[in-house]
C-alpha cells in the first residue's frame, strides 16, 4: 500500500476525495523498470494503470513504410515524473494502444487493472473520478498527436509545391 500523501502529489488524482485516495492507495504497488527496458507493446493486455514517480518513458507506435522495410518507431508522447500512462487498463478492450519504453530508470505506482475495474464497479463515484482523469489524459494525448500530424502535413504540403 502506498501512502495517501504520495498519491496526492499526482495531477491524475488531484480531484479525488480523501476516501477515494485511501481506496486507490489500497490497490497501489511500487514497480521499477530500467533504462532501455520495453514495458509493453501496442496490443498487449493492459495489466496496469501507472503513475510515474521518477524517470522518463517514451510512448511510441510503429509506422510501416512498406513491405520488406523495418517499422519506424514514432514517438507519440514522453511521460515524466508526476504523469500517468496506461489508461487502457480501464477502457475496453483493455489493450495498450501504444508501446512504452523507459529511457531512464523509472519508478512507478501501479494499479492492477482487474482490481481497479472491480473497485470502479463497486464505487461508482470513484469510477467516475477515474474516468474523468483518464479522459483528460486521452484529450491531452490527442492534442499532442494532432500537433504532430499538422506539423507533418504542413511540411509535406510545403515540400510538394
Which positions does each model-derived feature cover?
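Cytosolic regulatory regions built on CNB/CRP/Popeye-like sensor folds
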Residues: 1-161
Amino acid at each position: 500500500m502506498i501512502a495517501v500523501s504520495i498519491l496526492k502529489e499526482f495531477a491524475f488524482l488531484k480531484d479525488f476525495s480523501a476516501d477515494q485516495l485511501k481506496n486507490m492507495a489500497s490497490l497501489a504497488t511500487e514497480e521499477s523498470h530500467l533504462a532501455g527496458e520495453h514495458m509493453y507493446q501496442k496490443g498487449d493486455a493492459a495489466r496496469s494503470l501507472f503513475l510515474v514517480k521518477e524517470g522518463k518513458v517514451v510512448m511510441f507506435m510503429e509506422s510501416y513504410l512498406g513491405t520488406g522495410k523495418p517499422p519506424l518507431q514514432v514517438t507519440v508522447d514522453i511521460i515524466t515524473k508526476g504523469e500517468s500512462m496506461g489508461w487502457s487498463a480501464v477502457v475496453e478492450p483493455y489493450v495498450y494502444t501504444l508501446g512504452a519504453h523507459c529511457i531512464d530508470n523509472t519508478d512507478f505506482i501501479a494499479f492492477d487493472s482487474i482490481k481497479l475495474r472491480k473497485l470502479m464497479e463497486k464505487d461508482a463515484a470513484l469510477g467516475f473520478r477515474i474516468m474523468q482523469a483518464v479522459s483528460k489524459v486521452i484529450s491531452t494525448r490527442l492534442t499532442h498527436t494532432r500537433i504532430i500530424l499538422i506539423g507533418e502535413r504542413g511540411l509535406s504540403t510545403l515540400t510538394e509545391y
